[in-house]
Amino acid sequence: MGFEALSRGASHVTFVDKDRSCASAIKQSARQFKLEADSYEMISADFEKALSFFSRQGTSFDIIFVDPPYKMHLGGKIVQIVQTGRLLSNRGLLIVEHLPNELLDKIEVESYPQDSKLVPIDQRRYGSTSLTIFANALTVEE
């Protein structure tokens, strides 16, 4: 997805994968695509460590796309970490890929401050895969 985003005009993509062989494959693909070094970064880390790092740095993203291992049912946890870490820009989108039976639209968000609350705005199913898209609650209300 990151390479597709770059090909469609994204100025920068941050890849996160804890599997070193996947990280290596991403770097190799970037070289093959002749990407500018400042257009992407590859972080080899567990998603929780990476998101915590971004939060401490005050980094926010316009789009966060996550494709966690389905069997681990991490979608809800990721939404909560993105909310509490304030990792989305005001008009940003969080897109979570997950199993259709993982109900991410039912995540409890009432306890989060209004300016960091994420709400589901769309859900799509593609065969055995679902995508749930979240946005900042204040943006949705405008």
Model-flagged regions — what are they?
Residues M1-E142:
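Class I S-adenosyl-L-methionine-dependent methyltransferase catalytic core
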